[in-house]
Amino acid sequence: MPHRRSAYFVSDRTGITAESLGNALLTQFDMLEFKRETIPFIDTADKAMAVAEQIRQRAQSDHFRPLVFVSIVNPFVREAIQVDDCAMVIDFFHAFVGQLENELEQKATLTVGKSHGIISEEKYDTRIEAVNFSLNHDDGVKLKDLAEADVILVGVSRSGKTPTCLYLALQYGIKAANYPLTPEDLDSPTLPKMLLPYRKKIFGLTIEPQRLHHIRNERKPDSRYASIDNCRREVNEAESLFRHHGVPFISTTHKSIEEIASTILHHTGISRRF
């Protein structure tokens, strides 16, 4: 079995950018295992030198060069991470900012935290408002104000509606409500009455019965709710309902939350709100 390689994500802010880009690259090597560690808020030379020492020690103990993904704006802080002799360093920020400066004929401002900090109060408020809306309209708990929803996700229980709604709210500022199709809903050939006025906002989520059975069985083992026969019935009836009413839908079985959200935006034409 291949040796597990150490991978560091080093950032002057939250580490989200370094993690996202770094993991996007590492996932292309699915035959290897990685020991991942995120080190955020490295915003001084002293902190950077401490990180460099940590990486050096890891290189010694592993006998393999660690992979270091860096997203640090300040060049003096970045230069303090002197580990190029014992690690492979991928500097996301400075690898591209110089090329952009040349192309745009303008110097970068080199401002820390513009990707994930609160740059605009209006944009931040839009995100928080969307999150609150999604939380208040989760699982059909609150059907009031659905007219304000940008999209209403509909599907059987445990098909991925709630995490997708929250992701849409957090990442795009989209007001996403969701409604779980109950056995009573599935016995009817029509959409639930309370959803009919918002037909054009509905987007369906489905899932393979075997996967649904596995998820439900972890929550309520050996119950009728989790039985494979019941899962097959609910999924088949939900998909029939979607087709009958022309509701667009996708399977969440082999998709990440990010992929589900992107697919919904692509199908519906909804754009980010900030």
UniProtKB/Swiss-Prot annotation:
Similarity comment text for this entry: Belongs to the pyruvate, phosphate/water dikinase regulatory protein family. PSRP subfamily.
EC assignment: 2.7.11.33, 2.7.4.28
Signal peptide region: none
Write one Pfam family the protein is assigned to.
Kinase-PPPase
Species in which this protein is naturally found = Laribacter hongkongensis (strain HLHK9)
Q: State the disulfide connectivity.
A: none
| A GO term, aspect molecular function | phosphotransferase activity, phosphate group as acceptor
Superkingdom is Bacteria
Indicate yes or no for the key word Iron-sulfur: no
Q: Does the keyword Membrane apply?
A: no
Query: What is the protein name for this chain?
Result: Putative phosphoenolpyruvate synthase regulatory protein
In which residues is ADP bound? G155, V156, S157, R158, S159, G160, K161, T162
What's this chain's function? Answer: Bifunctional serine/threonine kinase and phosphorylase involved in the regulation of the phosphoenolpyruvate synthase (PEPS) by catalyzing its phosphorylation/dephosphorylation.
UniProt keywords, alphabetically: Kinase, Nucleotide-binding, Serine/threonine-protein kinase, Transferase
Catalytic activity as recorded in UniProt = [pyruvate, water dikinase] + ADP = [pyruvate, water dikinase]-phosphate + AMP + H(+); [pyruvate, water dikinase]-phosphate + phosphate + H(+) = [pyruvate, water dikinase] + diphosphate
